[in-house]
């Protein structure tokens, strides 16, 4: 039961993050065209996450040797919160927006890796409690959540553009203070709330961490060695 609860809380936390991330990423074009009036600079939104991915992906396991992933996840979320705050307050200042995008994109690998590892840890706990490893089901959760988040967010992106008047032949010069305020509300403030909720859910509801997982693995290995639990491969041989 705890395994299922933990998995669901991780899934909810990640889903909230995924929805916020996809919404904001999806409206970046409108930010550069209609708010900043700098469409030529839009390519920076592809360059920053590309470089961040190359650097942060190999850095995660190195940092995780000394820093628990709960804190790496928290640091990533705080970075995104800073990025959102800067985007909301200084959305018409290109240099500040670029710095904000660094805060926004850099922690993506940390957040995603933490979600994957947290889901993976629940596999051993499930095996310890019921004798079965549900790896395929568990590891398919994150891709499924990405698809759900993407589907939910795609409709939201179009709605944001429509509500803010960023459609048709409109230009940056046509944008009113009301249009910009509407855009920032749905592009930055609403996703910011989702990110904060994601952090709260993960921090207070997800229980399995590295220390607890190590204890689970130790207990599981002891039960496998004693024959109290039969691993899946052995069970398959017995059935055949």
Spans of model-derived segments:
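Membrane-embedded alpha-helical bundles of multi-pass transporters/translocases
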Residues: 1, 5-240
